């Protein structure tokens, strides 16, 4: 949050130090001048606030160059010169571009910061990322690509899907990720062409971050065709709950609540897409579907009467579990996946006929070596992959799972709405049946209404 010192407002900024005086603030970045009026302070402060995930990317000095600060300027404002040879990017916006925020102009071009030792500077953080990932369409070929947002696209199924779509040459993927630099490195490591992806920061455990992501995506001026809600967290061995920024148990707060808000906000964008393309896909899990063997492994998913969710899921005024019971990390994840499948069904019931958007969920197979299991015990991580490969025969590689999800994104044969897609070794994709717990329309409606209230949509 902004801090006041000597009558000035100093904002912790991801690119430099910005000092707000009583009258205004002026900066000089890359020989471009901009001034914010006092009336713009709340807007600019909001724009420049950076989430904890972005702060972790601070001070990437290995890219070379630094910012210098005029000590004389520090008494009233900050003058910064850029010696960089490359443009940087921040939160999905190219730094050299000018964006309008509530009447104030903000233009930033910088690569790294080395200001902490400068006198008078109270708070500094620097963020850098390759500019080429932020380019707006520069050719007819790029401009005509369809656009797909994938949450959690920096690893696992999300990254594999991004790769599969980019390889067609027909898709531009928006990688919505908590760790900006991890996503950038991941995209490069698998060879996704630089004109086929954009990384935009999104932490689903924070509603502020979700809303900022939507704003930043819209500033790219791309038409959204498909939203894939893929990201998930899983804490099977935790004895005590973790919580999101809004105070929800973290598995449900991230996997369900964050995605629910994101999907609702982006409905406006999806409705503008071409009818043959517009889809919303929410990744399910066999563990949340109790009519399967895996879904019957204790603890089983069970939302009960949603008593915990109705109370806020915060572990203080209510239980941290949706059903109001004692905390169980594995069950919290399974419950969140039931919520995902409920959300898909309710979107279909409420919006498909009116908008033509295809809403679906899927289970692409058991990705036994996914990073989702990184918090599991070592013995499980060692034995689970061979068990799935040689005993259940349900194992699927991340690459193959990514191709399957890419099918659900773009294959005309998988355009049926309200469907939970699954695969098996012999027959390929098929419409799977959901358990009674995961297909209760009254419970789905109640979940929707509670989620609307808790996310501030009503």
From Swiss-Prot:
The record's Pfam families line, in alphabetical order, gives: adh_short
Would the keyword NADP be found if you checked this record's keyword annotation? yes
Tell me the compartments it is located in: Plastid, Chloroplast
Q: In which pathway does it act?
A: Porphyrin-containing compound metabolism; chlorophyll biosynthesis
**Which Gene Ontology BP annotations are present?**
chlorophyll biosynthetic process; photosynthesis
- Keywords assigned by UniProt, alphabetized: Chlorophyll biosynthesis, Chloroplast, NADP, Oxidoreductase, Photosynthesis, Plastid, Transit peptide
Which reaction is recorded as catalysed by this protein?
chlorophyllide a + NADP(+) = protochlorophyllide a + NADPH + H(+)
Functional summary from the UniProt entry: Phototransformation of protochlorophyllide (Pchlide) to chlorophyllide (Chlide).
**Per the similarity annotation, which family is this?**
Belongs to the short-chain dehydrogenases/reductases (SDR) family. POR subfamily.
Protein name as annotated: Protochlorophyllide reductase, chloroplastic
What taxonomic classification does the UniProt entry list for its organism? Answer: Eukaryota, Viridiplantae, Streptophyta, Embryophyta, Marchantiophyta
């Amino acid at each position: 949050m902004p801090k006041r010192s000597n009558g000035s407002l100093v904002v912790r900024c991801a690119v430099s130090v910005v000092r707000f005086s009583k009258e205004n603030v002026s900066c000089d970045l890359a020989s471009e001048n901009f001034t914010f009026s006092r009336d713009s302070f709340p807007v600019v402060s909001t724009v420049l606030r950076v989430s904890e995930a972005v702060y972790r990317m601070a001070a990437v000095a290995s890219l070379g160059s630094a910012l210098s600060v005029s000590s004389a300027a520090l008494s009233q404002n900050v003058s910064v010169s850029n010696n960089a040879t490359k443009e940087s990017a921040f939160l999905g916006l190219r730094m050299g571009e000018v964006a309008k925020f509530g009447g104030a102009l903000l233009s930033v071009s910088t690569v790294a910061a080395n200001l902490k030792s400068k006198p008078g500077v109270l708070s500094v953080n620097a963020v850098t990322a390759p500019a080429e990932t932020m380019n707006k369409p520069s050719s007819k070929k790029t401009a005509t690509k369809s656009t797909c947002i994938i949450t959690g696209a920096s690893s696992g199924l999300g990254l594999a899907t991004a790769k599969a779509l980019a390889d067609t040459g027909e898709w531009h993927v928006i990688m919505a990720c908590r760790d900006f630099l991890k996503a950038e490195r991941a995209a490069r490591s698998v060879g996704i062409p630089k004109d086929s992806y954009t990384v935009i920061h999104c932490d689903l455990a924070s509603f502020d971050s979700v809303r900022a992501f939507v704003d930043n995506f819209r500033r790219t001026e791309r038409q959204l065709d498909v939203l894939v809600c893929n990201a998930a967290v899983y804490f099977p061995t935790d004895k005590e709950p973790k919580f999101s920024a809004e105070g929800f148990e973290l598995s449900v707060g991230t996997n369900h609540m964050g995605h629910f808000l994101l999907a609702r906000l982006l409905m406006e964008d999806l409705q503008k897409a071409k009818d043959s393309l517009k889809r919303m896909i929410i990744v399910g899990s066999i563990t949340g579907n109790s009519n399967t063997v895996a879904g019957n492994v204790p603890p089983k998913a069970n939302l009960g009467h949603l008593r915990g969710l109705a109370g806020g899921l915060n572990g203080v005024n209510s239980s941290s579990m949706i059903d109001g019971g004692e905390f169980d990390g594995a069950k919290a994840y399974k419950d969140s996946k039931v919520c995902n499948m409920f959300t898909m069904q309710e979107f279909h019931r409420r919006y498909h006929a009116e908008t033509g958007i295809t809403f679906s969920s899927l289970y692409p197979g058991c990705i036994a070596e996914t990073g989702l299991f990184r918090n599991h015990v070592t013995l499980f991580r060692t034995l689970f992959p061979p068990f799935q490969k040689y005993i259940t025969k349900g194992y699927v590689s991340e690459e193959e799972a990514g191709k399957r999800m890419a099918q659900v994104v773009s294959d005309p044969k998988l355009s049926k709405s309200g469907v939970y897609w699954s695969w098996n070794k012999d027959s390929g994709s098929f419409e799977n049946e959901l358990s009674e717990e995961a297909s209760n329309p009254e419970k789905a409606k109640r979940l929707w209404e509670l989620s609307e209230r808790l996310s501030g949509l009503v």
